[in-house]
């Protein structure tokens, strides 16, 4: 009897073991490299791989499945590609490309995969996000209505940028495009805006210089730099903007404000063209692939002003495009102009003639316009664009005319002084209330009897005078964001007083 009980126990134990048995077998779909060149591997055997999926090679290198062909897969290598050769095996990871996001990245320099490259140790990010995300839909957005002050008089007065807008900075090389972008970052100090600077295909020395400028100004406290330098592969240069925008979306979706700069998208398009041609995709105009428009539209559409239900956060994009000999009708410039909400044109001729920032006021527009300006700026800068346009027209005409009538001469003199007023030094953004004071002085005729060569000195001394003696006027403009009758009376009296002091000197 005892033996029978023992047999029952044994059989129940065996049954229990069978019921609870788990076969922990790691099943992976694997493949082998059949050819490898220029950072692209053709892999055979990954039958069920998804487009954009991560593929891991036996030496730890990772790649991105880009071309899904009948018999093989074109995999873009996300690294140096050392040790990869024909016959190297690889496996599917079953994940799409992700990047770390969050507050931990602020103040850091990362590569196109979100990995730190500044020598300050690992980043303790608590969250990751997919690099390729859909842009917010119409109902998730709100129209752009809050100003994003750049600190640059010519932009804030004439082509204002709003939070959630996409404003293109376009011009030839060495016209000050990056400087405009960096000054905008510097001006966000204390504005509770997280800035992301994405460098694509730049020299490492240039990036080091930008980071040094940001550190010296204390701007790295609210800035993240994403760098895919000229030494990096075309795949990493292609990915960098998407990594940057994903990092920015974290802040946008959490009710904060972000500013992202892509420097520059011309090199981004070139990197994508290089990648596409190696993948043997059919070339189109200027040898770019057919989806180069979508490359930039899906990136820039992710900048948005979110609705109140979604937290009312925003992400503003300032893409940069480099033109060749001022040709804004080339393929990539026209594409990006049509995607963005306006553009700031920088001209070589203006730059060389000492007008810096070299903004062509006639060609630069903001399609958001007055909605992105405070009332005080609208009050003082309303007529400025028109008078500058008239000045440019008269300037060309006046070169041939010997005797000018009084009205024309006055228009020319006002134009000359306003051009001087809009000049600004490198990395010297100006707070909006000071911009308003000097533009008010210019448009209301307080500069008419000041020599053109003295206008820059007049402005510098005016700001110092207001800081010392009439800071209450600056504070009133900043607080109310408009010039009421009382403020205007005080402003006029202060300007008269300053002119007396200035002329005496």
UniProtKB/Swiss-Prot annotation:
Q: How does it assemble?
A: F-type ATPases have 2 components, CF(1) - the catalytic core - and CF(0) - the membrane proton channel. CF(1) has five subunits: alpha(3), beta(3), gamma(1), delta(1), epsilon(1). CF(0) has three main subunits: a(1), b(2) and c(9-12). The alpha and beta chains form an alternating ring which encloses part of the gamma chain. CF(1) is attached to CF(0) by a central stalk formed by the gamma and epsilon chains, while a peripheral stalk is formed by the delta and b chains.
Write down the chemical reaction(s) this protein catalyses: ATP + H2O + 4 H(+)(in) = ADP + phosphate + 5 H(+)(out)
Q: Which GO terms describe its cellular component?
A: plasma membrane; proton-transporting ATP synthase complex
Presence of the UniProt keyword Transferase in the record:
no
Q: Which Pfam families match?
A: ATP-synt_ab, ATP-synt_ab_C, ATP-synt_ab_N
Membrane-related topology note: Peripheral membrane protein
Q: What is this protein called?
A: ATP synthase subunit alpha
Classification from the root reads: Bacteria, Pseudomonadati, Campylobacterota, Epsilonproteobacteria, Campylobacterales
Read off the InterPro entries from this record. Answer: ATP_synth_asu-like_sf (IPR023366), ATP_synth_asu_C (IPR000793), ATP_synth_asu_C_sf (IPR038376), ATP_synth_F1_a_nt-bd_dom (IPR033732), ATP_synth_F1_asu (IPR005294), ATPase_a/bsu_AS (IPR020003), ATPase_F1/V1/A1_a/bsu_N (IPR004100), ATPase_F1/V1/A1_a/bsu_N_sf (IPR036121)
The record's subcellular location field reads: Cell inner membrane
Is Cell membrane one of the keywords UniProt gives this record?
Answer: yes
User: Which residues make up the annotated site Required for activity?
Assistant: 364
Query: What does this protein do, in the record's words?
Result: Produces ATP from ADP in the presence of a proton gradient across the membrane. The alpha chain is a regulatory subunit.
What terms describe the molecular function in GO for this protein? ADP binding; ATP binding; proton-transporting ATP synthase activity, rotational mechanism
Q: Which family does it belong to?
A: Belongs to the ATPase alpha/beta chains family.
For this protein, the parts annotated as crossing the membrane are none
The UniProt annotation places ATP binding at: 171-178
Q: What is its main location?
A: membrane
Write the record's keywords in alphabetical order, separated by commas.
Answer: ATP synthesis, ATP-binding, Cell inner membrane, Cell membrane, CF(1), Hydrogen ion transport, Ion transport, Membrane, Nucleotide-binding, Translocase, Transport
Q: Which domain of life is it from?
A: Bacteria
E.C. number(s) listed in UniProt: 7.1.2.2
């Amino acid at each position: 009897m005892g033996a029978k009980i023992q047999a029952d126990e044994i059989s129940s134990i065996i049954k229990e073991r069978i019921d609870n048995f788990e076969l922990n077998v790691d099943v992976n779909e694997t493949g082998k490299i059949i050819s490898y060149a220029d950072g692209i591997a053709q892999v055979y055997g990954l039958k069920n791989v998804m487009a954009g999926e991560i593929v891991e090679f036996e030496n730890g290198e990772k790649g991105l499945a880009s071309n899904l062909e009948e018999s093989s897969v074109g995999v873009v290598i996300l690294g140096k590609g050392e040790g990869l050769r024909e016959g190297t095996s690889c496996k599917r990871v079953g994940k799409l490309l992700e990047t770390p996001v969050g507050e931990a990245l602020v103040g850091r320099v990362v590569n196109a995969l979100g990995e730190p490259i500044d020598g300050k140790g690992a980043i303790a990010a608590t969250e990751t996000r997919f690099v390729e995300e859909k842009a917010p839909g119409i109902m998730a957005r709100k129209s752009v209505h809050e100003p994003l002050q750049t600190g640059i008089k010519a932009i804030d007065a004439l082509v204002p940028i709003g939070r959630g807008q996409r404003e293109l900075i376009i011009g030839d090389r060495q016209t000050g495009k990056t400087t405009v972008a960096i000054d905008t970052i510097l001006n966000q100090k204390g504005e509770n805006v997280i800035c992301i600077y994405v460098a694509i295909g730049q020299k490492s020395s240039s990036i080091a210089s930008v980071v040094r400028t940001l550190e010296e100004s204390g701007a790295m406290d609210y800035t993240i730099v994403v760098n895919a330098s000229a030494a990096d592969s075309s795949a990493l240069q292609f990915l960098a903007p998407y990594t940057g925008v994903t990092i920015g979306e974290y802040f946008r979706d959490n009710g904060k404000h972000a500013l992202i700069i892509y420097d520059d998208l011309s090199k981004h398009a070139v990197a994508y063209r290089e990648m596409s041609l190696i993948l043997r995709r059919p070339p189109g105009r200027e040898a770019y692939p057919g989806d180069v428009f979508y490359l930039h539209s899906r990136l820039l559409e992710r900048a948005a002003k979110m609705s109140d239900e979604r937290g009312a956060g925003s992400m503003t994009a300032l893409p940069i495009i480099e033109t060749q000999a001022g040709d804004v009708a080339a393929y990539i410039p026209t594409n990006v102009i049509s995607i963005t909400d306006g553009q700031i044109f920088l001209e070589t001729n203006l730059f060389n003639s000492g007008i810096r920032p070299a903004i062509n006021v006639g060609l630069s527009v903001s399609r958001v316009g007055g909605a992105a300006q405070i009332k005080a700026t609208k009050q003082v800068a309303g007529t400025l664009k028109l008078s500058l346009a008239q000045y440019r027209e008269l300037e060309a005409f006046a070169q041939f005319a010997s005797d000018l009538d009084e009205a024309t001469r006055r228009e020319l003199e006002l134009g000359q002084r306003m051009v001087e007023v809009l000049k600004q030094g490198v990395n010297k953004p100006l707070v909006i209330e000071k911009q308003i004071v000097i533009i008010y002085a210019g448009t209301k005729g307080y500069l008419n009897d000041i020599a053109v060569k003295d206008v820059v000195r007049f402005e510098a001394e005016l700001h110092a005078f207001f800081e010392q003696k009439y800071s209450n006027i600056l504070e009133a403009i900043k607080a109310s964001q408009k010039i009421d009758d009382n403020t205007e009376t005080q402003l006029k009296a202060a300007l008269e007083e300053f002119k007396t002091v200035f002329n005496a000197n």
